[in-house]
Amino acid sequence: MFACDNGERELPLTFGDLSQIIQDMSEKQIFDYCSNYINKIGVKKEFRKIEIDNLFQLIQIREKFFPLEPVIIKYYKEKRKSAVKHLLPITQEQINTITDGMSTKQREEFVNRRYAQLKERNYVKDAYIANYKINDSQWHEDIRFFDANEFNNKIDILVGGSPCQSFSNYGKKLGLEDVRGTLFYDYARIIKESRPKIFIYENVENVTKNDGGKTWEVMFDVWQSLGYHIEWAILDAKDYNHPQLRSRLFLIGFREDIFTKPYTFPPKMELTHRSTEYLEAGPIDDIYYLGKKGFEWITTPSKNLRRSRVNQDVIGCETANQQDNWIGDFRVEHPLPHHYTDTRIYVGQFDFGDGNGRVDAVGRKMTPRECMNLMGFDDTFKIVVNDSIAYRHAGNSIVVPVLKELIKSIIPYIS
């Protein structure tokens, strides 16, 4: 077993990186390079006021260079009270320039070392290592620089996908034009290098509709070029006895030498579970209950917002909100729980539609454990990250019961 991150954490562009990149450039070339770089990365909010001239002055190629970070901090201390605490991000193109001449393995080791130097936790790695039989040597920081050749013909099933935000109704729908969408090509590259017997690719349903279907045509052509028999379908979690409306694309590739008989996706199952079965028993901490504004937000109808409540048999789709990485699933409770003490918790009026009219009720967001449960993870799954990260992990996950049914359906092709 091994795991790859999608390289979402940004590596800083260091003084040494710039020195190496621009060492043979003229001043005009340096200026043009900085201009193009600024435009390409889409400068972050805290850097928008740094004119290109200012950046150019920071990168002097004569007698000595001046480190970027202290100068930027000084600049911002003069312009505003808050100081910038990190450098500009490095691009994949810049990494390729710096590591020119290195082997694929050496390039990956270089990138891994750079990630190790970051003074921030990799929460995805924390969750993997806490829950699966995987160690540091089996963890790869950035899929873009992962060398999969060492796994050639050693993998039975490869499961993965590219970030869904590029294609999701909740995202910008830029598809393959989004840098996150282009990670699809890295997943395809890993398949080409490692040649697994079977691979499973998961993404949002909208990937087939993006740009009038053109994105999907491009992606499908790539899949077919890899030498695999391809099957795909849109599967909904509720059709596999799991109470969540979550339609997702599942594409399965069978290596041609093992595809000896037709494949059919798992048949639909009767839904016997209810969403309330996955809620935590006992008192829920006050921090999950809503104040007046939050209660009114989830109980006021809106045509522009999809809000789901766990007061029904099947909940709406859990999603990692793209702006604050927060899952928008809520529960309205009546009778009122007796355990809470926080005076900020708001008691509002709510009609459950049961004929009893409007009653006093409180609202709360789901706990991270409940979100994990509703994605199919049982209580043995360790949550070792803070709530906001746990919500994100749950919202970005594959529904476990659906994946289990898929795995069962493809095992005969391996054995």
Segments (PLM) and residue ranges:
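Class I S-adenosyl-L-methionine
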Residues: 4, 13-17, 21, 37, ...
